[in-house]
C-alpha cells in the first residue's frame, strides 16, 4: 500500500494567479487594482509582514495598489510566500477620515478576497456566528469604536483550513482596516 502524499502549503489553496480574479471582480465594483509588483529585497517585510505563527518563510511578495474610479488611493492587496506560492494574503484599506467613511470599499474588497482565496461558503458556514462577512466587519467596527485600544483584532480560524485576521487600527484620525488570510 502506498502512503498518501501530503501536499505542501504552497500546493493547496490560493495562488499568486488569483490576483487576476480579484482584480476582475473588484473592477465590477468600480475598484481598480494595479498590476502586481514583485518584491524580493530587504523591504519585503514592509509589504508582506512576518508572522510568528507561520513556520514557513516569506521571501517573495507581490503588492498591488487599489484605487477608486478617480484614481484616488484606497489601499493595497499583497500576497507573500516563496516562488512556489503564497502562504498569506493581505488587504489594507485606509478609511480616513472616519472609521466608516469607506465601508462599502472595505466590504467589497474583504468579501472578494475571502470568496476567491478561501471559499464562497461564508453564508453556509457562518464562522464565528456571523451570517456574512459584512456582519463580521460591522461588529468589529462597533467594538473598535467603543475600545480605548489603538488596534482591534478579530480572528476566525479554520475556515477551509485557513485563518482570517481582521485588524482595525486607529491613530490620529487615521483608520486602517487590514484583512490577513493565512494558509
Label every model-predicted segment.
Residues 1-27:
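N-terminal Sec-dependent export signals
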Residues 19-104:
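Extracytoplasmic beta-rich ectodomain segments of secreted or membrane-anchored proteins
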Residues 28-49, 119-156:
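Short glycine-rich, low-complexity/disordered patches
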Residues 45-50, 71-78, 138-143, 158-167:
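Short small/polar-residue motifs
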Residues 52, 65, 123-125, 166:
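Extracellular/secretory pathway and lumenal proteins
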Residues 58-72, 139-160:
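Short, solvent-exposed secondary-structure boundary motifs
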Residues 73-144:
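Long, charged/polar, surface-exposed segments that mediate recognition or autoinhibition
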Residues 154-174, 179-181:
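Short, exposed beta-strand-loop hairpins at the edges of beta-sheets
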Amino acid at each position: 500500500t502506498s502512503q498518501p502524499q501530503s501536499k505542501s502549503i504552497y500546493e493547496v489553496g490560493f495562488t499568486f494567479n488569483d490576483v487576476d480574479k480579484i482584480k476582475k471582480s473588484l473592477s465590477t465594483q468600480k475598484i481598480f487594482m494595479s498590476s502586481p509588483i514583485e518584491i524580493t529585497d530587504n523591504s519585503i517585510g514592509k509589504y508582506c509582514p512576518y508572522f510568528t505563527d507561520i513556520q514557513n518563510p516569506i521571501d517573495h511578495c507581490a503588492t498591488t495598489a487599489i484605487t477608486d474610479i478617480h484614481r484616488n488611493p484606497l489601499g493595497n492587496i499583497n500576497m507573500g510566500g516563496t516562488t512556489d506560492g503564497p502562504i498569506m494574503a493581505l488587504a489594507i484599506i485606509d478609511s480616513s477620515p472616519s472609521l466608516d467613511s469607506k465601508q462599502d470599499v472595505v466590504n467589497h474588497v474583504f468579501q472578494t478576497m475571502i470568496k476567491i482565496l478561501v471559499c464562497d461558503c461564508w453564508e453556509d458556514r457562518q464562522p464565528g456566528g456571523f451570517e456574512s462577512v459584512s456582519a463580521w466587519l460591522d461588529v468589529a467596527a462597533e467594538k473598535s469604536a467603543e475600545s480605548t485600544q489603538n488596534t482591534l483584532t478579530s480572528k476566525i480560524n479554520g475556515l477551509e483550513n485557513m485563518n482570517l485576521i481582521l485588524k482595525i487600527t486607529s491613530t490620529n484620525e487615521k483608520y486602517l482596516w487590514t484583512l490577513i488570510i493565512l494558509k
